[in-house]
């Protein structure tokens, strides 16, 4: 592999590395979405919430005279967090009482796990490719990174639809929502994994001959 090509491969791997870090941050944090209830009484407290793939946190926030909504979530208040019990039927947070909503949440978490699995396998292939004459391992590594980006983008879209469906439901007290920084990290990570994986795949593929005679001319003469 030439020095120019090696430099391009390193740039692609750096892009993928940033995507991996953002993907891990998105999966382990709980700021995918922020939910706000309807404010009926001023000079009282309201309960806002933010959640991720595994945990939901509610916070009691004081509402002033001029406030029309509950929040922002960064205001000080009494905080209470609980983990989702995705795989235990009949045990879920009160906010996820609707069966369809719980299915959405389980799907997003499961797809995110697949994404992390693809990242781990792709990273192993990339590390093994650094050994001499093992550049061919960059091809499966790039494919695994592309699959990870696709899974993460699907997980983000499922979560977005999940939140929208919950807010639109008649069985919930939440009337407003906003996608938070963990969701943005997931979207950026998916884009970096897709772009970096595709670039790495193109760099790892063998060079096609410019004309039909090139491969014959480059062949070693028979003795």
From Swiss-Prot:
Q: Which GO BP terms, alphabetically?
A: establishment of localization in cell; regulation of calcium ion transmembrane transport via high voltage-gated calcium channel; sarcoplasmic reticulum calcium ion transport
Membrane-crossing segments per the record:
11-29, 110-130, 136-156, 181-205
Q: InterPro entries from the xrefs?
A: PMP22/EMP/MP20/Claudin, VDCC_g1su, VDCC_gsu
Carbohydrate attachment sites? 43, 80
Principal subcellular localisation of the protein:
membrane
Describe PTMs of this protein: N-glycosylated.
Q: Which key words tag this protein in UniProt?
A: Calcium, Calcium channel, Calcium transport, Cell membrane, Disulfide bond, Glycoprotein, Ion channel, Ion transport, Membrane, Transmembrane, Transmembrane helix, Transport, Voltage-gated channel
Any GO CC annotation of this UniProt entry: L-type voltage-gated calcium channel complex
Q: Which residues lie on this side of the membrane: Cytoplasmic?
A: 1-10, 131-135, 206-223
Q: List the disulfide bonds.
A: 57-81
Named from the GO MF annotations, one term is: calcium channel regulator activity
Please give the residue ranges for the topological domain Extracellular.
30-109, 157-180
Subcellular location(s): the record lists: Cell membrane, Sarcolemma
UniProt topology in membrane: Multi-pass membrane protein
Question: Which Pfam family, any one, appears in the UniProt record?
Answer: Claudin_2
Q: Which family does it belong to?
A: Belongs to the PMP-22/EMP/MP20 family. CACNG subfamily.
**What function is annotated for this protein?**
Regulatory subunit of the voltage-gated calcium channel that gives rise to L-type calcium currents in skeletal muscle. Regulates channel inactivation kinetics.
Quaternary structure note? Component of a calcium channel complex consisting of a pore-forming alpha subunit (CACNA1S) and the ancillary subunits CACNB1 or CACNB2, CACNG1 and CACNA2D1. The channel complex contains alpha, beta, gamma and delta subunits in a 1:1:1:1 ratio, i.e. it contains either CACNB1 or CACNB2.
PANTHER family on file: VOLTAGE-DEPENDENT CALCIUM CHANNEL GAMMA-1 SUBUNIT, VOLTAGE-DEPENDENT CALCIUM CHANNEL GAMMA-1 SUBUNIT-RELATED
The protein's name is Voltage-dependent calcium channel gamma-1 subunit
Please name the taxonomic classification of the source. Answer: Eukaryota, Metazoa, Chordata, Craniata, Vertebrata
Q: Which gene encodes it?
A: CACNG1
């Amino acid at each position: 592999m030439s020095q120019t090509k090696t430099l391009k491969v390193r740039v692609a791997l750096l892009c993928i590395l940033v995507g991996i870090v953002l993907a891990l941050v998105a999966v382990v944090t709980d700021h995918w979405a922020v939910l706000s209830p309807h404010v009926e009484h001023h000079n009282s407290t309201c309960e806002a919430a933010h959640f991720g793939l595994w945990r939901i946190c509610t916070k009691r926030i004081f509402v002033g005279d001029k406030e029309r909504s509950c929040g922002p979530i960064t205001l000080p208040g009494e905080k209470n967090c609980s983990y989702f019990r995705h795989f235990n039927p009949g045990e879920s947070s009160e906010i996820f009482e609707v069966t369809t909503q719980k299915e959405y949440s389980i799907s997003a978490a499961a797809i995110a796990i697949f994404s992390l699995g693809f990242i781990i396998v792709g990273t192993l292939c990339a590390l093994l490719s650094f050994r001499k004459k093992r550049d061919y391992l960059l091809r499966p590594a790039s494919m695994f990174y592309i699959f990870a980006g696709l899974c993460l983008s699907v997980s983000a879209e499922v979560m977005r639809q999940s939140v929208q469906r919950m807010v639109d439901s008649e069985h919930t007290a939440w009337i407003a929502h906003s996608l938070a920084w963990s969701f943005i990290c997931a979207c950026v990570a998916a884009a970096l994994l897709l772009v970096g994986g595709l670039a790495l795949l193109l760099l790892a593929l063998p060079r096609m001959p410019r004309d039909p005679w090139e491969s014959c001319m480059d062949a070693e003469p028979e003795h």
